[in-house]
Amino acid sequence: MHKLNRYFFVLVLIALVALPVRPQLSVKPNAFKRDPSSKALKWANEQLRKMSLEEKIGQLISVGVNATFLNQDSDDYRALKHQIEDNKVGGIILFRGQVYESVILVNRMQELAKYPLLISADLEAGAGMRFESTVNFPWNMAVAATGNPEYARRQGEITAREARALGVQQIFAPVVDVNNNAANPVINVRSYGEDPADVARFAVAFTEGAQAAGAIATAKHFPGHGDTAVDSHRGLPEINVGRDRLNSVEFVPFKASVDAGVGAVMVGHIAMPQIDATAVKPLPENLKSKPTDTDEAGEIIEEKAAMPATMSPVIGNILRKDLKFPGMIVTDALSMSGLTIYFTQEEAAVRALEAGADMLLKPADADASFRGVHEAVKSGRITEQRVEESARKILAAKYDLGLVDQRITPIDTIDRIVGSRDVPALATEIAEHAVTLVRDEDKLVPLKNLKPGSRVFNLAVTNGDDRAWIANAFVTRLARGGVKVETIVLDDRSTDQEVQKAIERAKTADLVIASLYGRVRSGQALSVGVPEPGARALSALITAKSPILGISFGNPYLLQGFPGLRTYLVAYGDMPSLQQAVARALLGEIDITGKLPISLPGLYPRGTGIQIKKTSHR
Protein backbone atom coordinates (compact mmCIF):
# COMPACT_ATOMS: atom_id res chain seq x y z
CA MET A 1 0.00 0.00 0.00
CA HIS A 2 2.83 2.39 0.88
CA LYS A 3 4.60 1.56 -2.38
CA LEU A 4 1.40 2.36 -4.29
CA ASN A 5 1.05 5.74 -2.53
CA ARG A 6 4.69 6.53 -3.20
CA TYR A 7 4.25 5.60 -6.87
CA PHE A 8 1.14 7.78 -7.15
CA PHE A 9 2.97 10.72 -5.51
CA VAL A 10 5.84 10.44 -7.98
CA LEU A 11 3.42 10.44 -10.93
CA VAL A 12 1.67 13.57 -9.63
CA LEU A 13 5.01 15.32 -9.08
CA ILE A 14 6.12 14.50 -12.63
CA ALA A 15 2.82 15.79 -14.00
CA LEU A 16 3.16 19.07 -12.10
CA VAL A 17 6.72 19.59 -13.27
CA ALA A 18 5.63 18.93 -16.85
CA LEU A 19 3.01 21.68 -16.74
CA PRO A 20 4.07 24.82 -18.62
CA VAL A 21 5.15 27.64 -16.35
CA ARG A 22 2.79 30.55 -16.86
CA PRO A 23 4.75 33.80 -16.72
CA GLN A 24 3.25 36.52 -14.60
CA LEU A 25 3.04 40.08 -15.81
CA SER A 26 4.84 42.37 -13.43
CA VAL A 27 2.56 44.65 -11.44
CA LYS A 28 4.05 47.60 -13.26
CA PRO A 29 6.34 47.26 -16.29
CA ASN A 30 9.49 49.32 -16.20
CA ALA A 31 9.22 52.81 -17.66
CA PHE A 32 10.26 52.95 -21.29
CA LYS A 33 13.15 55.25 -22.12
CA ARG A 34 14.00 56.18 -25.69
CA ASP A 35 17.75 55.76 -25.31
CA PRO A 36 18.44 52.01 -25.21
CA SER A 37 20.16 50.55 -22.18
CA SER A 38 23.66 49.14 -22.50
CA LYS A 39 22.27 45.64 -21.91
CA ALA A 40 19.73 46.16 -24.70
CA LEU A 41 22.39 47.26 -27.17
CA LYS A 42 24.63 44.35 -26.20
CA TRP A 43 21.81 41.86 -26.75
CA ALA A 44 20.76 43.49 -30.03
CA ASN A 45 24.31 43.39 -31.36
CA GLU A 46 24.67 39.74 -30.34
CA GLN A 47 21.54 38.86 -32.29
CA LEU A 48 22.61 40.86 -35.34
CA ARG A 49 25.90 38.96 -35.50
CA LYS A 50 23.96 35.70 -35.68
CA MET A 51 21.17 36.87 -38.00
CA SER A 52 20.94 36.26 -41.70
CA LEU A 53 20.21 39.18 -44.01
CA GLU A 54 16.65 37.88 -44.37
CA GLU A 55 16.14 37.89 -40.60
CA LYS A 56 17.46 41.43 -40.32
CA ILE A 57 15.07 42.65 -43.04
CA GLY A 58 12.17 40.86 -41.37
CA GLN A 59 12.71 42.82 -38.16
CA LEU A 60 11.79 46.03 -39.98
CA ILE A 61 8.37 44.83 -41.15
CA SER A 62 5.19 44.97 -39.05
CA VAL A 63 2.15 43.25 -40.55
CA GLY A 64 -1.49 43.99 -39.80
CA VAL A 65 -4.17 41.65 -38.52
CA ASN A 66 -7.75 41.92 -37.30
CA ALA A 67 -7.39 40.01 -34.07
CA THR A 68 -10.47 37.83 -34.25
CA PHE A 69 -10.69 34.07 -33.78
CA LEU A 70 -8.69 32.31 -36.50
CA ASN A 71 -8.81 28.58 -37.05
CA GLN A 72 -5.29 27.29 -37.63
CA ASP A 73 -6.31 25.93 -41.03
CA SER A 74 -7.86 29.22 -42.20
CA ASP A 75 -6.30 31.28 -44.98
CA ASP A 76 -5.84 34.30 -42.68
CA TYR A 77 -4.05 32.25 -40.05
CA ARG A 78 -1.81 30.59 -42.62
CA ALA A 79 -0.97 33.97 -44.16
CA LEU A 80 0.01 35.41 -40.77
CA LYS A 81 2.00 32.30 -39.88
CA HIS A 82 3.84 32.59 -43.21
CA GLN A 83 4.93 36.12 -42.34
CA ILE A 84 6.16 35.04 -38.91
CA GLU A 85 7.97 31.87 -39.94
CA ASP A 86 9.13 32.63 -43.48
CA ASN A 87 9.67 36.39 -43.61
CA LYS A 88 10.62 36.53 -39.91
CA VAL A 89 8.70 39.80 -39.54
CA GLY A 90 9.50 41.80 -36.44
CA GLY A 91 6.05 42.96 -35.43
CA ILE A 92 2.28 42.94 -35.72
CA ILE A 93 -0.13 45.86 -35.67
CA LEU A 94 -3.51 44.87 -34.26
CA PHE A 95 -6.79 46.14 -35.62
CA ARG A 96 -10.32 45.50 -34.34
CA GLY A 97 -10.78 42.36 -32.27
CA GLN A 98 -11.97 40.77 -29.06
CA VAL A 99 -9.81 40.86 -25.96
CA TYR A 100 -9.07 37.19 -25.40
CA GLU A 101 -9.00 36.24 -29.07
CA SER A 102 -6.42 38.99 -29.64
CA VAL A 103 -4.14 37.91 -26.81
CA ILE A 104 -4.38 34.22 -27.66
CA LEU A 105 -3.54 34.90 -31.31
CA VAL A 106 -0.61 37.15 -30.41
CA ASN A 107 0.70 34.61 -27.90
CA ARG A 108 0.60 31.89 -30.52
CA MET A 109 2.53 34.10 -32.95
CA GLN A 110 5.04 34.95 -30.23
CA GLU A 111 5.59 31.22 -29.72
CA LEU A 112 6.18 30.72 -33.45
CA ALA A 113 8.55 33.68 -33.80
CA LYS A 114 12.30 33.15 -33.57
CA TYR A 115 12.70 36.62 -32.07
CA PRO A 116 10.13 38.42 -29.88
CA LEU A 117 7.49 40.33 -31.82
CA LEU A 118 6.85 44.02 -31.17
CA ILE A 119 3.06 44.36 -30.98
CA SER A 120 1.47 47.73 -31.73
CA ALA A 121 -1.99 49.25 -32.03
CA ASP A 122 -3.67 52.59 -32.71
CA LEU A 123 -4.90 53.40 -29.21
CA GLU A 124 -5.49 57.15 -29.60
CA ALA A 125 -8.70 56.86 -27.59
CA GLY A 126 -7.61 54.05 -25.30
CA ALA A 127 -7.95 50.29 -25.55
CA GLY A 128 -11.56 50.62 -26.69
CA MET A 129 -10.37 51.92 -30.06
CA ARG A 130 -9.22 48.40 -30.99
CA PHE A 131 -10.47 45.96 -28.37
CA GLU A 132 -14.19 45.17 -28.07
CA SER A 133 -15.81 45.50 -24.63
CA THR A 134 -13.11 47.83 -23.32
CA VAL A 135 -13.36 51.54 -22.53
CA ASN A 136 -13.03 54.29 -25.14
CA PHE A 137 -11.64 57.55 -23.85
CA PRO A 138 -12.94 60.79 -25.39
CA TRP A 139 -11.05 62.01 -28.44
CA ASN A 140 -8.03 64.29 -27.98
CA MET A 141 -10.00 67.43 -28.83
CA ALA A 142 -12.36 66.67 -25.95
CA VAL A 143 -9.39 66.21 -23.64
CA ALA A 144 -8.03 69.60 -24.74
CA ALA A 145 -11.46 71.20 -24.24
CA THR A 146 -11.05 70.54 -20.52
CA GLY A 147 -7.97 72.77 -20.49
CA ASN A 148 -6.19 70.30 -18.21
CA PRO A 149 -3.15 68.35 -19.59
CA GLU A 150 -3.19 66.16 -16.50
CA TYR A 151 -6.10 64.31 -18.09
CA ALA A 152 -3.87 63.49 -21.06
CA ARG A 153 -1.17 62.23 -18.72
CA ARG A 154 -3.58 59.96 -16.86
CA GLN A 155 -5.06 58.75 -20.13
CA GLY A 156 -1.59 57.91 -21.44
CA GLU A 157 -0.75 56.01 -18.26
CA ILE A 158 -3.96 53.97 -18.28
CA THR A 159 -3.75 53.30 -22.01
CA ALA A 160 -0.22 51.95 -21.64
CA ARG A 161 -1.15 49.88 -18.60
CA GLU A 162 -4.04 48.24 -20.44
CA ALA A 163 -2.00 47.86 -23.62
CA ARG A 164 0.74 45.94 -21.81
CA ALA A 165 -1.86 43.70 -20.18
CA LEU A 166 -3.22 42.98 -23.68
CA GLY A 167 0.16 42.12 -25.15
CA VAL A 168 0.70 45.47 -26.87
CA GLN A 169 3.97 47.30 -26.29
CA GLN A 170 3.81 50.20 -28.76
CA ILE A 171 0.99 52.73 -28.89
CA PHE A 172 0.51 54.68 -32.10
CA ALA A 173 -0.46 57.80 -30.17
CA PRO A 174 -0.57 60.65 -29.43
CA VAL A 175 -1.76 62.47 -32.53
CA VAL A 176 0.23 65.71 -32.43
CA ASP A 177 -1.12 67.23 -35.64
CA VAL A 178 -2.24 70.87 -35.35
CA ASN A 179 -5.78 70.88 -36.74
CA ASN A 180 -5.90 74.35 -38.31
CA ASN A 181 -8.01 73.34 -41.31
CA ALA A 182 -11.75 73.11 -40.69
CA ALA A 183 -12.13 70.96 -43.82
CA ASN A 184 -9.73 68.27 -42.60
CA PRO A 185 -11.58 64.96 -43.14
CA VAL A 186 -9.35 62.61 -41.17
CA ILE A 187 -7.68 64.39 -38.21
CA ASN A 188 -10.36 66.73 -36.81
CA VAL A 189 -11.19 65.67 -33.22
CA ARG A 190 -8.20 63.30 -33.14
CA SER A 191 -6.10 66.46 -32.69
CA TYR A 192 -5.70 68.42 -29.46
CA GLY A 193 -6.61 71.59 -31.36
CA GLU A 194 -5.30 74.40 -33.52
CA ASP A 195 -2.83 76.07 -31.16
CA PRO A 196 0.66 74.54 -31.52
CA ALA A 197 1.67 75.26 -27.92
CA ASP A 198 -1.50 73.70 -26.52
CA VAL A 199 -1.14 70.63 -28.74
CA ALA A 200 2.44 70.31 -27.49
CA ARG A 201 1.41 70.52 -23.82
CA PHE A 202 -1.19 67.77 -24.12
CA ALA A 203 0.96 65.58 -26.37
CA VAL A 204 3.90 65.73 -23.98
CA ALA A 205 1.65 64.89 -21.03
CA PHE A 206 0.22 61.83 -22.81
CA THR A 207 3.69 60.71 -23.87
CA GLU A 208 5.12 60.99 -20.37
CA GLY A 209 2.18 59.09 -18.89
CA ALA A 210 2.34 56.30 -21.46
CA GLN A 211 6.08 55.75 -21.34
CA ALA A 212 6.17 55.89 -17.54
CA ALA A 213 3.73 52.96 -17.64
CA GLY A 214 6.00 50.91 -19.87
CA ALA A 215 4.87 51.41 -23.47
CA ILE A 216 6.43 53.19 -26.45
CA ALA A 217 4.49 56.33 -27.35
CA THR A 218 4.49 57.36 -31.01
CA ALA A 219 3.97 60.99 -32.06
CA LYS A 220 2.15 61.23 -35.39
CA HIS A 221 1.84 62.18 -38.30
CA PHE A 222 5.11 63.97 -39.11
CA PRO A 223 5.57 66.53 -40.66
CA GLY A 224 1.93 67.37 -39.80
CA HIS A 225 -1.46 66.23 -41.08
CA GLY A 226 -3.56 69.03 -39.61
CA ASP A 227 -3.72 71.54 -42.47
CA THR A 228 -4.94 69.08 -45.09
CA ALA A 229 -8.23 68.62 -46.91
CA VAL A 230 -7.52 65.11 -48.26
CA ASP A 231 -7.60 61.88 -46.27
CA SER A 232 -4.33 60.00 -46.83
CA HIS A 233 -6.32 56.75 -46.77
CA ARG A 234 -7.88 57.91 -50.07
CA GLY A 235 -5.23 60.12 -51.67
CA LEU A 236 -2.07 62.14 -51.13
CA PRO A 237 -2.69 65.28 -49.04
CA GLU A 238 -0.54 68.34 -49.56
CA ILE A 239 0.63 71.11 -47.24
CA ASN A 240 2.05 73.80 -49.47
CA VAL A 241 3.91 75.96 -46.94
CA GLY A 242 7.53 76.90 -46.32
CA ARG A 243 9.94 76.06 -43.56
CA ASP A 244 9.26 79.18 -41.47
CA ARG A 245 5.59 78.29 -41.20
CA LEU A 246 6.41 74.64 -40.41
CA ASN A 247 8.80 75.71 -37.67
CA SER A 248 6.18 77.94 -36.04
CA VAL A 249 3.15 75.64 -36.38
CA GLU A 250 3.41 72.02 -37.52
CA PHE A 251 6.81 71.22 -36.01
CA VAL A 252 6.15 72.76 -32.58
CA PRO A 253 4.43 69.74 -30.96
CA PHE A 254 6.81 67.31 -32.66
CA LYS A 255 9.83 69.18 -31.29
CA ALA A 256 8.27 69.27 -27.83
CA SER A 257 7.58 65.53 -28.02
CA VAL A 258 11.13 64.80 -29.14
CA ASP A 259 12.51 66.92 -26.30
CA ALA A 260 10.25 65.03 -23.87
CA GLY A 261 11.75 61.70 -24.94
CA VAL A 262 9.02 60.25 -27.15
CA GLY A 263 10.14 56.80 -28.25
CA ALA A 264 8.89 56.86 -31.82
CA VAL A 265 7.60 59.20 -34.52
CA MET A 266 5.26 58.13 -37.29
CA VAL A 267 5.78 59.81 -40.67
CA GLY A 268 2.66 60.38 -42.76
CA HIS A 269 1.97 60.17 -46.47
CA ILE A 270 1.89 63.95 -46.91
CA ALA A 271 3.36 66.01 -49.74
CA MET A 272 5.31 69.16 -48.85
CA PRO A 273 6.18 70.67 -52.25
CA GLN A 274 8.03 73.66 -50.78
CA ILE A 275 10.30 71.26 -48.87
CA ASP A 276 10.67 68.44 -51.41
CA ALA A 277 9.31 69.26 -54.86
CA THR A 278 10.33 65.93 -56.42
CA ALA A 279 7.44 65.00 -58.70
CA VAL A 280 5.61 61.68 -58.52
CA LYS A 281 3.09 60.24 -60.97
CA PRO A 282 0.33 57.66 -60.51
CA LEU A 283 1.23 54.08 -61.30
CA PRO A 284 -0.46 52.21 -64.14
CA GLU A 285 -3.49 50.32 -62.83
CA ASN A 286 -1.82 46.95 -63.34
CA LEU A 287 1.00 47.88 -60.94
CA LYS A 288 -1.09 49.43 -58.17
CA SER A 289 -2.01 47.63 -54.98
CA LYS A 290 -5.73 47.15 -54.54
CA PRO A 291 -7.19 49.89 -52.28
CA THR A 292 -7.91 48.51 -48.83
CA ASP A 293 -8.77 51.64 -46.84
CA THR A 294 -11.39 53.42 -48.99
CA ASP A 295 -15.14 53.17 -49.45
CA GLU A 296 -17.04 52.94 -52.73
CA ALA A 297 -16.22 56.59 -53.48
CA GLY A 298 -12.72 55.37 -54.24
CA GLU A 299 -9.35 57.05 -54.41
CA ILE A 300 -8.46 60.70 -54.96
CA ILE A 301 -5.79 60.69 -57.65
CA GLU A 302 -3.66 63.72 -58.44
CA GLU A 303 -1.84 63.42 -61.76
CA LYS A 304 0.84 65.84 -60.56
CA ALA A 305 1.98 65.45 -56.98
CA ALA A 306 5.09 65.94 -54.86
CA MET A 307 7.02 63.29 -52.97
CA PRO A 308 5.22 61.91 -49.87
CA ALA A 309 7.08 62.57 -46.62
CA THR A 310 7.42 58.83 -45.99
CA MET A 311 9.51 58.57 -49.17
CA SER A 312 11.46 61.83 -48.78
CA PRO A 313 15.06 61.86 -47.47
CA VAL A 314 14.75 65.65 -47.25
CA ILE A 315 11.93 65.43 -44.71
CA GLY A 316 13.61 62.49 -42.97
CA ASN A 317 16.72 64.61 -42.47
CA ILE A 318 14.65 67.39 -40.90
CA LEU A 319 13.38 64.95 -38.30
CA ARG A 320 16.75 63.34 -37.61
CA LYS A 321 19.10 66.31 -37.89
CA ASP A 322 17.08 69.47 -37.27
CA LEU A 323 14.66 68.15 -34.65
CA LYS A 324 17.44 65.85 -33.37
CA PHE A 325 15.24 62.77 -33.06
CA PRO A 326 17.34 59.65 -32.37
CA GLY A 327 14.47 57.20 -31.83
CA MET A 328 12.40 54.86 -33.95
CA ILE A 329 10.82 56.24 -37.14
CA VAL A 330 7.70 54.40 -38.26
CA THR A 331 5.97 54.79 -41.61
CA ASP A 332 2.24 55.25 -41.70
CA ALA A 333 0.57 52.15 -43.14
CA LEU A 334 2.13 51.32 -46.51
CA SER A 335 -1.27 50.03 -47.64
CA MET A 336 -2.83 53.53 -47.69
CA SER A 337 -3.80 55.02 -51.04
CA GLY A 338 -1.76 58.16 -50.37
CA LEU A 339 1.21 55.91 -51.08
CA THR A 340 -0.06 53.01 -53.20
CA ILE A 341 -1.32 55.33 -55.96
CA TYR A 342 2.28 56.32 -56.70
CA PHE A 343 4.56 53.48 -55.56
CA THR A 344 4.72 49.71 -55.70
CA GLN A 345 5.20 47.96 -52.38
CA GLU A 346 8.73 46.93 -53.36
CA GLU A 347 9.76 50.50 -54.19
CA ALA A 348 7.91 52.02 -51.23
CA ALA A 349 9.77 49.83 -48.74
CA VAL A 350 13.17 50.74 -50.18
CA ARG A 351 12.42 54.45 -50.44
CA ALA A 352 11.11 54.51 -46.87
CA LEU A 353 14.43 53.15 -45.63
CA GLU A 354 16.31 55.65 -47.79
CA ALA A 355 14.19 58.37 -46.18
CA GLY A 356 15.20 57.24 -42.70
CA ALA A 357 12.38 54.93 -41.60
CA ASP A 358 13.05 52.05 -39.23
CA MET A 359 9.69 50.25 -39.22
CA LEU A 360 7.75 49.46 -42.39
CA LEU A 361 4.18 49.41 -41.12
CA LYS A 362 1.37 47.30 -42.57
CA PRO A 363 2.47 46.77 -46.18
CA ALA A 364 -0.31 45.97 -48.62
CA ASP A 365 1.91 43.07 -49.69
CA ALA A 366 4.52 42.18 -47.07
CA ASP A 367 6.14 39.63 -49.38
CA ALA A 368 6.71 42.38 -51.94
CA SER A 369 8.11 44.77 -49.33
CA PHE A 370 10.48 42.08 -48.06
CA ARG A 371 11.52 41.24 -51.62
CA GLY A 372 12.10 44.89 -52.49
CA VAL A 373 14.47 45.49 -49.57
CA HIS A 374 16.27 42.19 -50.15
CA GLU A 375 16.91 43.01 -53.81
CA ALA A 376 18.00 46.55 -52.92
CA VAL A 377 20.66 45.19 -50.56
CA LYS A 378 21.84 42.59 -53.07
CA SER A 379 22.10 45.24 -55.80
CA GLY A 380 23.96 47.67 -53.55
CA ARG A 381 21.22 50.30 -53.62
CA ILE A 382 21.12 50.19 -49.81
CA THR A 383 23.69 48.57 -47.53
CA GLU A 384 23.22 45.74 -45.09
CA GLN A 385 24.56 48.14 -42.46
CA ARG A 386 21.58 50.42 -43.15
CA VAL A 387 19.23 47.51 -42.48
CA GLU A 388 21.16 46.66 -39.31
CA GLU A 389 20.87 50.24 -38.08
CA SER A 390 17.07 50.01 -38.00
CA ALA A 391 16.97 46.41 -36.82
CA ARG A 392 19.23 47.36 -33.90
CA LYS A 393 16.78 50.04 -32.73
CA ILE A 394 13.85 47.65 -32.90
CA LEU A 395 15.68 44.78 -31.20
CA ALA A 396 16.98 47.04 -28.42
CA ALA A 397 13.48 48.37 -27.81
CA LYS A 398 12.20 44.79 -27.48
CA TYR A 399 14.86 44.06 -24.88
CA ASP A 400 14.09 47.17 -22.83
CA LEU A 401 10.37 46.35 -23.01
CA GLY A 402 11.11 43.03 -21.32
CA LEU A 403 10.17 40.87 -24.29
CA VAL A 404 13.37 38.84 -24.23
CA ASP A 405 12.53 37.50 -20.77
CA GLN A 406 8.77 37.38 -21.28
CA ARG A 407 7.09 37.54 -24.63
CA ILE A 408 3.93 35.61 -23.68
CA THR A 409 1.07 37.65 -22.19
CA PRO A 410 -0.60 35.93 -19.21
CA ILE A 411 -4.32 35.46 -19.76
CA ASP A 412 -5.23 35.33 -16.08
CA THR A 413 -4.20 38.93 -15.33
CA ILE A 414 -6.27 40.58 -18.07
CA ASP A 415 -9.55 40.89 -16.18
CA ARG A 416 -7.73 42.30 -13.16
CA ILE A 417 -6.05 45.08 -15.14
CA VAL A 418 -8.18 45.93 -18.17
CA GLY A 419 -11.32 47.93 -17.44
CA SER A 420 -10.60 48.49 -13.74
CA ARG A 421 -12.75 51.11 -12.03
CA ASP A 422 -10.40 54.00 -12.66
CA VAL A 423 -10.70 53.56 -16.44
CA PRO A 424 -14.41 54.40 -16.96
CA ALA A 425 -14.11 56.90 -14.11
CA LEU A 426 -11.44 58.85 -15.98
CA ALA A 427 -13.39 58.67 -19.26
CA THR A 428 -16.43 60.09 -17.48
CA GLU A 429 -14.43 62.82 -15.73
CA ILE A 430 -12.85 63.97 -19.00
CA ALA A 431 -16.18 63.91 -20.80
CA GLU A 432 -17.98 65.94 -18.15
CA HIS A 433 -15.30 68.64 -18.23
CA ALA A 434 -15.18 68.69 -22.04
CA VAL A 435 -18.80 69.52 -22.92
CA THR A 436 -18.73 72.94 -24.59
CA LEU A 437 -21.68 75.29 -25.01
CA VAL A 438 -20.81 77.51 -27.97
CA ARG A 439 -24.11 79.32 -28.48
CA ASP A 440 -27.41 79.52 -26.60
CA GLU A 441 -29.40 82.45 -27.95
CA ASP A 442 -32.74 81.02 -26.80
CA LYS A 443 -31.50 80.00 -23.33
CA LEU A 444 -32.42 76.35 -23.83
CA VAL A 445 -29.57 74.99 -21.70
CA PRO A 446 -30.09 73.47 -19.20
CA LEU A 447 -33.59 72.14 -19.78
CA LYS A 448 -34.93 73.62 -16.55
CA ASN A 449 -37.64 75.58 -18.36
CA LEU A 450 -39.06 72.46 -19.99
CA LYS A 451 -42.61 72.03 -18.69
CA PRO A 452 -43.86 68.64 -17.46
CA GLY A 453 -45.39 66.70 -20.33
CA SER A 454 -43.50 68.64 -22.99
CA ARG A 455 -42.79 66.73 -26.21
CA VAL A 456 -39.10 66.44 -26.97
CA PHE A 457 -38.06 65.14 -30.37
CA ASN A 458 -34.52 63.98 -31.11
CA LEU A 459 -33.49 64.23 -34.76
CA ALA A 460 -30.35 62.08 -34.84
CA VAL A 461 -28.23 62.26 -37.99
CA THR A 462 -25.38 59.79 -38.45
CA ASN A 463 -22.67 59.27 -41.05
CA GLY A 464 -22.23 55.66 -39.94
CA ASP A 465 -24.04 52.37 -40.38
CA ASP A 466 -25.34 52.45 -36.83
CA ARG A 467 -28.87 53.88 -36.90
CA ALA A 468 -30.18 51.11 -34.63
CA TRP A 469 -28.12 52.12 -31.61
CA ILE A 470 -26.12 55.30 -32.16
CA ALA A 471 -28.28 57.57 -29.96
CA ASN A 472 -29.03 55.03 -27.22
CA ALA A 473 -26.53 56.25 -24.61
CA PHE A 474 -27.79 59.83 -24.94
CA VAL A 475 -31.55 59.24 -24.85
CA THR A 476 -31.31 56.58 -22.14
CA ARG A 477 -29.47 58.97 -19.84
CA LEU A 478 -31.99 61.74 -20.54
CA ALA A 479 -34.81 59.35 -19.67
CA ARG A 480 -33.13 58.51 -16.36
CA GLY A 481 -33.27 62.23 -15.59
CA GLY A 482 -36.98 62.42 -16.39
CA VAL A 483 -36.78 63.71 -19.97
CA LYS A 484 -38.25 61.22 -22.40
CA VAL A 485 -37.62 61.80 -26.07
CA GLU A 486 -38.85 60.38 -29.34
CA THR A 487 -35.96 59.68 -31.71
CA ILE A 488 -35.74 59.24 -35.46
CA VAL A 489 -32.32 58.49 -36.93
CA LEU A 490 -31.47 59.57 -40.47
CA ASP A 491 -28.47 58.35 -42.46
CA ASP A 492 -27.40 58.18 -46.09
CA ARG A 493 -29.91 55.36 -46.72
CA SER A 494 -32.91 57.29 -45.43
CA THR A 495 -35.78 57.70 -47.88
CA ASP A 496 -37.71 60.86 -48.71
CA GLN A 497 -40.60 59.41 -46.71
CA GLU A 498 -38.39 59.00 -43.63
CA VAL A 499 -37.12 62.55 -43.98
CA GLN A 500 -40.65 63.91 -44.26
CA LYS A 501 -41.79 61.88 -41.25
CA ALA A 502 -38.93 63.30 -39.18
CA ILE A 503 -39.80 66.87 -40.20
CA GLU A 504 -43.48 66.39 -39.36
CA ARG A 505 -42.75 64.83 -35.97
CA ALA A 506 -40.29 67.61 -35.13
CA LYS A 507 -42.72 70.39 -36.02
CA THR A 508 -45.20 69.15 -33.41
CA ALA A 509 -42.58 68.99 -30.64
CA ASP A 510 -42.02 71.57 -27.92
CA LEU A 511 -38.27 71.12 -28.29
CA VAL A 512 -36.17 69.60 -31.05
CA ILE A 513 -32.75 68.18 -30.25
CA ALA A 514 -30.58 67.81 -33.34
CA SER A 515 -27.97 65.17 -32.47
CA LEU A 516 -25.34 65.30 -35.19
CA TYR A 517 -23.06 62.27 -35.37
CA GLY A 518 -20.68 63.57 -38.04
CA ARG A 519 -17.59 61.67 -37.01
CA VAL A 520 -14.14 60.96 -38.40
CA ARG A 521 -14.45 57.89 -40.61
CA SER A 522 -11.06 57.22 -42.16
CA GLY A 523 -11.22 56.35 -45.84
CA GLN A 524 -14.89 57.33 -46.13
CA ALA A 525 -16.14 60.06 -48.47
CA LEU A 526 -18.60 61.29 -45.83
CA SER A 527 -16.04 61.46 -43.03
CA VAL A 528 -16.80 64.29 -40.54
CA GLY A 529 -19.92 65.26 -42.51
CA VAL A 530 -23.63 64.57 -42.19
CA PRO A 531 -25.58 62.76 -44.93
CA GLU A 532 -27.87 64.67 -47.26
CA PRO A 533 -31.19 63.32 -45.87
CA GLY A 534 -30.32 64.50 -42.36
CA ALA A 535 -28.96 67.83 -43.56
CA ARG A 536 -32.16 68.40 -45.55
CA ALA A 537 -34.37 67.67 -42.55
CA LEU A 538 -32.37 69.93 -40.23
CA SER A 539 -32.30 72.79 -42.74
CA ALA A 540 -36.08 72.57 -43.11
CA LEU A 541 -36.55 72.81 -39.35
CA ILE A 542 -34.18 75.77 -39.07
CA THR A 543 -36.12 77.53 -41.84
CA ALA A 544 -39.38 76.79 -40.00
CA LYS A 545 -37.87 78.41 -36.88
CA SER A 546 -38.45 75.33 -34.73
CA PRO A 547 -36.85 75.54 -31.25
CA ILE A 548 -33.70 73.50 -31.91
CA LEU A 549 -30.90 72.51 -29.59
CA GLY A 550 -28.03 71.40 -31.81
CA ILE A 551 -25.39 68.99 -30.50
CA SER A 552 -22.29 67.81 -32.32
CA PHE A 553 -21.31 64.33 -31.20
CA GLY A 554 -18.26 64.56 -33.43
CA ASN A 555 -17.02 67.25 -35.81
CA PRO A 556 -17.22 70.60 -33.96
CA TYR A 557 -17.12 72.57 -37.22
CA LEU A 558 -20.64 71.43 -38.24
CA LEU A 559 -22.09 74.77 -37.11
CA GLN A 560 -20.54 76.28 -40.26
CA GLY A 561 -22.99 74.27 -42.33
CA PHE A 562 -25.97 75.16 -40.13
CA PRO A 563 -25.32 78.73 -38.92
CA GLY A 564 -29.04 79.13 -38.22
CA LEU A 565 -28.78 76.87 -35.17
CA ARG A 566 -29.38 79.25 -32.26
CA THR A 567 -28.18 76.78 -29.63
CA TYR A 568 -25.09 74.70 -30.29
CA LEU A 569 -23.27 72.37 -27.96
CA VAL A 570 -20.14 70.32 -28.76
CA ALA A 571 -19.16 66.93 -27.34
CA TYR A 572 -16.33 66.10 -29.81
CA GLY A 573 -17.29 62.43 -30.11
CA ASP A 574 -19.92 59.73 -29.79
CA MET A 575 -18.35 57.71 -26.96
CA PRO A 576 -20.89 56.67 -24.30
CA SER A 577 -19.08 58.83 -21.74
CA LEU A 578 -19.56 61.91 -23.94
CA GLN A 579 -23.20 61.19 -24.77
CA GLN A 580 -24.00 60.66 -21.11
CA ALA A 581 -22.09 63.81 -20.14
CA VAL A 582 -24.14 65.89 -22.59
CA ALA A 583 -27.35 64.43 -21.19
CA ARG A 584 -26.25 65.28 -17.65
CA ALA A 585 -25.32 68.80 -18.75
CA LEU A 586 -28.76 69.32 -20.29
CA LEU A 587 -30.38 68.00 -17.12
CA GLY A 588 -28.41 70.52 -15.08
CA GLU A 589 -26.60 67.77 -13.17
CA ILE A 590 -23.06 68.97 -13.99
CA ASP A 591 -21.35 72.29 -14.64
CA ILE A 592 -20.67 73.14 -18.28
CA THR A 593 -17.06 74.30 -18.45
CA GLY A 594 -15.52 73.19 -21.77
CA LYS A 595 -13.88 75.61 -24.20
CA LEU A 596 -13.26 75.23 -27.93
CA PRO A 597 -9.65 74.15 -28.67
CA ILE A 598 -10.25 75.32 -32.25
CA SER A 599 -11.92 78.31 -33.87
CA LEU A 600 -15.07 78.03 -35.96
CA PRO A 601 -13.99 80.22 -38.90
CA GLY A 602 -16.27 83.20 -39.39
CA LEU A 603 -18.26 82.37 -36.26
CA TYR A 604 -16.34 81.87 -33.00
CA PRO A 605 -12.70 82.09 -31.85
CA ARG A 606 -10.73 79.42 -30.05
CA GLY A 607 -11.49 79.47 -26.34
CA THR A 608 -15.22 80.09 -26.76
CA GLY A 609 -17.36 78.36 -24.16
CA ILE A 610 -20.36 79.54 -22.17
CA GLN A 611 -19.92 78.53 -18.53
CA ILE A 612 -23.04 77.32 -16.73
CA LYS A 613 -23.38 76.08 -13.16
CA LYS A 614 -25.36 72.95 -12.46
CA THR A 615 -28.94 73.42 -11.28
CA SER A 616 -29.61 69.92 -9.98
CA HIS A 617 -27.95 68.07 -7.11
CA ARG A 618 -28.78 64.57 -8.28
Task: For every predicted segment, state its role.
Residues 66-69, 121-129, 169-179, 219-225, ...:
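Short glycine-enriched loops at secondary-structure junctions
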Residues 78-95, 157-171:
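Catalytic domains of carbohydrate-active enzymes, especially glycoside hydrolases
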Residues 146-168, 175-196, 200-203, 207, ...:
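A substrate-binding/cap region within the structured catalytic cores of diverse enzymes
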